[in-house]
């Protein structure tokens, strides 16, 4: 049996450039170090910060977080792979997270997942070839009273039918930064 070896790393920084920037280190030092008893306890906030900045956690960033927190790289990797919400490979512009809790299952989340899988021509955990969508299932979105629920990037959509989900997906703007919670009138915020 032959092993297929594929280098899945993506270089985001030029040689010598750090992904864990000085600004990020300062934020971790000032905001999180005082709140936690050890540097190890800052691993989760550090991983969240990296993922929020880049959309995923590159291998280089894992190594830099480990060095910054004075941990073994394996400890940081173990933490990142233990939790579902961390991404160690790039994902699509839109992360479609379908809740698979009991409440959502009873109310039709399986139909939503199956429909998205067929519509986007991907399996759960995969990204479309155009890198626009990544489809995943999560154990619970905490919206049992309004099931089924789907999280699109960071916007929660509740009581969804297949038709409503279709309309939602078809109306998503090309630029995910232009997408926001449709229930908020952004004009009143500014």
What does each model-found stretch correspond to?
Residues 1-190:
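Signature of N-terminal electron-transfer/Fe-S-associated modules in redox systems
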């Amino acid at each position: 049996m032959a092993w297929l070896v594929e280098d899945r790393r993506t270089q985001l920084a030029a040689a010598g450039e750090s992904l864990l920037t000085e600004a990020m280190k300062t934020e971790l030092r000032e905001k999180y170090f005082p709140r936690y008893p050890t540097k190890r306890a800052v691993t989760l906030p550090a991983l969240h910060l990296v993922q929020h900045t880049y959309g995923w956690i590159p291998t280089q960033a894992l190594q830099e977080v480990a060095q910054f927190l004075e941990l073994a790289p394996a400890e940081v990797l173990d933490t990142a792979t233990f939790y579902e919400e961390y991404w160690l490979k790039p994902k699509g512009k839109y992360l479609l997270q379908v809740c698979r809790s009991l409440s959502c299952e009873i109310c039709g989340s399986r139909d939503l997942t199956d429909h998205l899988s067929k519509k986007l021509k991907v399996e759960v955990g995969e990204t479309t070839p155009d890198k626009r969508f990544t489809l995943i299932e999560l154990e619970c979105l905490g919206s049992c009273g309004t099931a089924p629920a789907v999280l699109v990037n960071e916007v929660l959509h509740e009581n969804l039918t297949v038709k409503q989900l279709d309309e939602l997906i078809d109306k998503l703007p090309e630029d995910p930064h232009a997408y926001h919670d449709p229930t908020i009138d952004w004009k009143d915020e500014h």
